[in-house]
Amino acid sequence: MGMMQEFKEFAIKGNVIDLAVGVIIGAAFSKIVDSVVGDLIMPVVGAVIGKLDFSNMFVVLRSVPPGIPTTLDALKKAGVPVFAYGNFITVAVNFAILAFIIFLMVKQINRLKRREVVKPTTAPAEDIMLLREIRDSLKKQA
């Protein structure tokens, strides 16, 4: 079998296609979670804490040179070391929500798989049972 034929069989198998679909859906789903965190959850958390914009929460680790604005972007461009923890908080909340949703999805999939495996086996048909009895009877006579 040639390499191209092997690759074709590999690429057409369900697992590769399932993986590709999963990656595409995951990328789109990640954008939804980013929006939920950035647009819905973090503003509520910010309103409770008193700061609405977490991206500008930081601590300057060294003195700021004169004439440099004290915004995070300006300090980073000037090479001033800053401990930018606000963006980390947003990313951590984003990760926690995404991980929880994936956990719920995997839990549901596993529950459905268990339900499929436990299907009761049906008893053989009456004519099959009769044929088996005849077969067993013939074996005993022989």
UniProtKB/Swiss-Prot annotation:
Keywords: Cell inner membrane, Cell membrane, Ion channel, Ion transport, Membrane, Transmembrane, Transmembrane helix, Transport. The keyword Coiled coil does not apply. GO terms for molecular function: mechanosensitive monoatomic ion channel activity. InterPro entries: Mechanosensitive_channel_CS (IPR019823), MS_channel (IPR001185), MSC/AndL (IPR037673), MscL_channel (IPR036019). GO terms for cellular component: plasma membrane. It is a multi-pass membrane protein. It is found in: Cell inner membrane. Disulfide bonds: none annotated. It comes from the Bacteria. The chain crosses the membrane at residues 10-30, 86-106. Homopentamer. Channel that opens in response to stretch forces in the membrane lipid bilayer. May participate in the regulation of osmotic pressure changes within the cell. Belongs to the MscL family. This is Large-conductance mechanosensitive channel.
